[in-house]
Amino acid sequence: MNTRLVGSEMCIRDSLKIGPGTDPESEMGPLVTAAHKAKVEGDIDQGVAEGAELVVDGRGLVLQGYENGFYTGGTLFDRVTPDMSIYKDEIFGPVLSVVRVDDHAAASKLVNEHEFGNGAAIFTRDGDAAREFARNVEIGMVGVNVPIPVPMAFHSFGGWKRSLFGDHHMHGPEGVRFYTKYK
């Protein structure tokens, strides 16, 4: 992980169009409820309190004409460590946590030791390293040179471990049983 990547996220933040979900120009809409917004912004507060470097702060976003909306802007943390709650917990909001490692083996180990297995991203110029990482990590989705592993909302979830969704949960036998009535 290098500092240029973290710096480039600032450009993404400045160009990200946040607005109502009904606006076709919006790239990111509001969070679901006031409680959801409070939870996500509380997670951001906790990350700051635990010592993560807050590079982009999305808290307190107010959009003109939508002052009562549940908007939180994109948030970027750098220098996150595995003992921090923003690393341990799944944050269902626009929060990206960067964990720096020395090599690809350390990255795979870090991902595999995590209790959740929803998705991870790797940034590299080495195609072989990206393929090896994707093969070796025990997660449902891998993004290569993208900040999130699934950039399309209609893509089915494929999380593993405690992430619930995946081929052993709603996208597998449990989902078939849920939508099937035996006669």
How would you describe each model-predicted region?
Residues E50:
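Conserved dinucleotide-binding and phosphotransfer motif residues
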Residues K17-I18, M28, I44, E67-K183:
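Conserved C-terminal structural/oligomerization subdomain of aldehyde/semialdehyde dehydrogenase
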Residues L31-E41:
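Short beta-strand to alpha-helix junction loop
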Residues M1-I12:
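Single conserved hydrophobic/aromatic residue that forms the stacking wall/gate
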